[in-house]
Curated annotation (Swiss-Prot):
The gene is eno. Its main location: cytoplasm. Keywords: Cytoplasm, Glycolysis, Lyase, Magnesium, Metal-binding, Secreted. PANTHER family: ENOLASE. The keyword GTP-binding does not apply. Binds a second Mg(2+) ion via substrate during catalysis. (2R)-2-phosphoglycerate binds at residues 165, 206, 338, 367-368. Its cofactor is Mg(2+). Mg(2+) 1 binds at residues 243, 286, 313. Phosphoenolpyruvate binds at residues 41, 165, 313, 338, 367-368, 389. Optimum pH is 6.5, thermostable up to 85 degrees Celsius, at 90 degrees it loses about 50% activity. This is Enolase.
């Protein structure tokens, strides 16, 4: 059985928004093949690795990825054919060196990540192992609590709230299967609640409902009603997570809440979150402040860090250097993990390990532009991270990850453990 790379082929495919993205196949001398499709985001952090797009307005409004495809089929293939796919760290180091830029702008983080993931999948297949076991070893056994984005606003919807995501987390369930069922039942009840109030039940990019609502906490009121009407206890069985994506509403040193007609300073924004946490069972707040508001983040943690998981997404961009700085500055206490923010599997695993060693939590996440690729489901189990953020229980691009987790839980049998409330350090 040889795990040496025999061929690497990339192609342009479509993501869940109908935009082009890159798919990569890596074939080994053993005949085993790994395939990966790279996701893309709508609200992207300024410090993310660069997603290479063509910029040719005559194709896909400039969003084509033929340059990234060419980078894989020519530069990367030439460098990696004959390379051992089982040597993941060396392979990723070779890709990073081949690019030679700080943000992967030469070859594109999308090109590099596609090869990085496809190689790992090919190696796992060659060893006859599921991806979670190949990456995580014998101790990979924790099924995550899903962060289910059941109401969308901000960049993921139009004419909705200032804030991007309102999520539920079934922390009181006994298993992932049960937690998923609870979430799905609440999701369907929420649709009825929204419909009965005369609002639209159209969905956003991640499957959550996106009605036009009068205030920013109106979605929380509707979600609380749906939880109770579905027969569950808020704060005990079901808790709430928010991703307001405040970088999107931050300008000239202020947070502009257009739905409420006011602009807030960093300190006022922190007080805003304290008030919401006092009124609703919110356990997790992601990007509660803008990506470079370091002083604000430290204040947020000082005021809420012992009660709420404070997740850095645009703030930390799965980047070890930014994470290390945040740990030292006591800004945030959790990191969102998005493979394509940093652009390689090894760097992603390094960020998760640093967070866990530092007593932080790590939340493995999708992007708003997704596909049928289920890598993140295996990654979250491989790292025992305990939390996954992959949308509403709707749309195949989201459901694919949940279904993969159901399969993994079944395969693990009695060894499987659902993270539940122990997923949190607060």
């Amino acid at each position: 059985m040889s795990t040496l790379i025999e061929a690497i082929v990339a192609r342009e495919v479509l993501d869940s928004r109908g935009n082009p993205t890159i798919e990569v196949d890596v074939r080994l001398e053993s005949g085993d093949v790994g395939r990966a499709i790279v996701p893309s985001g709508a609200s992207t952090g300024a410090h993310e690795a660069l997603e290479l797009r063509d910029g040719d307005k005559s194709r896909y409004n400039g969003k084509g990825v033929l340059k990234a495809v060419q980078a894989v089929n020519e530069d990367i293939a030439e460098a990696l054919i004959g390379f051992d796919a089982a040597d993941q760290i060396a392979l990723d180091q070779e890709l990073i060196a081949l690019d030679g830029t700080p943000n992967k702008s030469k070859l594109g983080a999308n090109a590099i990540l596609g090869v990085s993931l496809a190689a790992a999948k090919a190696a796992a297949a060659a060893f006859g192992l599921p991806l979670y076991r190949y990456l995580g070893g014998v101790y990979a056994h924790v099924l995550p609590v899903p962060m289910m984005n059941i109401m969308n606003g901000g960049q993921h919807a139009t004419n909705s709230t200032d804030f991007q995501e309102f999520m539920i987390m079934p922390v009181g369930a006994e298993s992932f299967r049960e937690g998923l069922r609870w979430g799905a039942e609440i999701y369907h009840m929420l649709k009825k609640v929204i419909h009965d109030r005369g609002f639209s039940t159209t969905v956003g990019d991640e499957g959550g409902f996106a009605p036009s609502l009068p205030t920013n906490d109106a979605p929380l009121q509707l979600i609380m009603e749906a939880i109770e009407k579905a027969g569950y206890r808020p704060g005990e069985q079901i808790v709430i997570a928010l991703d307001p994506a405040t970088t999107e509403i931050f300008e000239d040193g202020k947070y502009h809440l257009k739905r409420e007609g006011r602009s807030l300073s960093s300190a006022e924004m922190v007080d805003y979150w304290v008030d919401l946490v006092n009124r609703y069972p919110i356990i997790s707040l992601e990007d509660g402040l803008a990506e470079d508001d370091w002083e604000g983040w430290a204040l947020l943690r000082a005021k809420l860090g012992d009660r709420v998981q404070l997740v850095g997404d645009d703030f930390l961009v799965t980047n070890v250097q930014r994470l290390q700085r945040a740990i030292e500055a006591k800004a945030a206490n959790s990191i969102l993990i998005k493979l394509n923010q940093i652009g390689s599997l090894t760097e992603t695993l390094s960020a998760i390990q640093l967070a866990q060693r530092s007593g932080w939590t790590a939340v493995v996440s999708h992007r708003s532009g997704e596909s049928e690729d289920v890598t993140i489901a295996d990654l979250v189990v491989a790292t025992n991270a305990g939390q996954i953020k992959t949308g509403a229980p709707a749309r195949t691009d989201r459901i694919a990850k949940y279904n993969q987790l159901l399969r993994i839980e079944e395969e693990l049998g009695s060894a499987a453990r659902y993270a539940g409330r122990s997923a949190f350090k607060v």
